[in-house]
């Protein structure tokens, strides 16, 4: 009987830890997916491709639907820009959400002076100190 109670308590504890940590674990592992999705947008931003494939790709970012995922996606985009310096002050890249008429990605799309750690689900645009 004691063994069953101990096993049940241990199982409950492990399940609780998994539930609590899952949003953070998921937000840490999204960069490969975000990078793959925005590849056509990088090509467009650098003047190497038309905008249509980028606009279609942005719809795949709908999985970024929690505060932690939006913040993580924002950090991924900062990484993309840091690896492609031609995008840093590039209005063509910054204006992709507007040009694609995509309001969903605007709050976490990269732009100068964005603070990824301050993004929430209801944010429109956040311009603060540069996060580079």
UniProtKB/Swiss-Prot annotation:
Residues 1-27 form the signal peptide. Transmembrane segments: none annotated. One of its GO terms (biological process) is killing of cells of another organism. One of its GO terms (molecular function) is lipid binding. Pfam families: Tryp_alpha_amyl. Disulfide bonds join 31-76, 41-54, 55-100, 74-116. Keywords: Antibiotic, Antimicrobial, Disulfide bond, Fungicide, Plant defense, Signal. The keyword rRNA processing does not apply. It comes from the Eukaryota. Monomer. Antifungal and antibacterial activity against the Gram-positive bacteria B.megaterium and S.lutea. Belongs to the plant LTP family. Highly divergent. This is Antimicrobial protein Ace-AMP1.
């Amino acid at each position: 009987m004691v063994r069953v109670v101990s096993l049940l308590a241990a199982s409950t504890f492990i399940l609780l830890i998994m539930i609590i940590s899952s949003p953070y674990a998921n937000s840490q592992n999204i960069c490969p997916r975000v990078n793959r999705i925005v590849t056509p947008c990088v090509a467009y931003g650098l003047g190497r491709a038309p905008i249509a494939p980028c606009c279609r790709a942005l719809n795949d970012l709908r999985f970024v639907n929690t505060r932690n995922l939006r913040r993580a996606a924002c950090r991924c985009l900062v990484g993309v820009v840091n690896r492609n310096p031609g995008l840093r002050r590039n209005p063509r890249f910054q204006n992709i959400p507007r040009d694609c008429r995509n309001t969903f990605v605007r709050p976490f799309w990269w732009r100068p002076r964005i603070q990824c750690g301050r993004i929430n689900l209801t944010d429109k645009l956040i311009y603060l100190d540069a996060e580079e």
